[in-house]
A protein has these predicted regions:
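Recognizes extended acidic, P/S/T-rich segments that occur
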Residues: 1-7
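Activation on beta-sandwich/Ig-like modules and their edge loops
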Residues: 8-9, 19-23, 28-175
């Protein structure tokens, strides 16, 4: 059950805590109509750039510790990823202030130390929960109450490249 329904009219009042943790007075009521978020910029500019779903392991570190997913902003404007979340596949919520400038990458992994030992200098922006399915799956990034922003379905069978299935290679966007 949703708390707020699209098209519904609502009134809200807010208060906040200041730096000394004292509460402010309540604001005057504000009336609004709930609508869909504007996702056009995100949908046009954000892509799955690389997916390492079935990596090779190494001595003392299981293969799954090297999984990662990389997003890229291919648009011309900075994108605000704050509050976006994965509604299928892995589990991760982008924290407030997650901005992605044009051309920048945002890499999520399972184990920061393992990834940085294999790829020195790699910036790991966040740690996801769960695991990328070695047999393939759909990964969906969503906003708000679940509006899809970006989705990809990969597989470990043709026409997908076999080298990405446990042979040390990742799936990379073809642009």
């Amino acid at each position: 059950q949703r708390v707020i329904r699209k098209g519904g009219t609502y009134r809200a009042r807010v208060r906040m805590r200041n730096g000394t943790m004292a509460w402010s007075h309540w604001s005057p009521p504000v009336e609004f109509v709930a609508g869909e978020p504007d996702l056009a910029g995100l949908r046009a500019g954000l892509v799955f750039n690389e997916i390492m779903y079935n990596p090779l392991g190494q001595a003392g570190v299981s293969a799954g510790e090297f999984e990662f997913l990389e997003l890229k902003n291919i648009g011309e404007s900075t994108l605000d990823l704050s509050g976006l979340f994965f509604s299928s596949g892995i589990s991760f919520i982008f924290p407030e202030g997650s901005m992605l400038a044009s051309g920048e990458l945002f890499l999520l992994g399972i184990n920061r130390a393992a990834l940085q030992s294999r790829y020195p200098g790699l910036v790991v922006n966040g740690i996801f929960e769960g695991k990328l399915a070695n047999e393939g799956e759909a990964i969906t990034l969503s906003a708000g109450i679940g509006a899809p922003v970006l989705s990809v379905a990969y597989d470990d069978a043709a026409p997908w490249p076999e080298q990405a299935d446990g042979q040390g290679f990742s799936l990379a966007a073809d642009r």
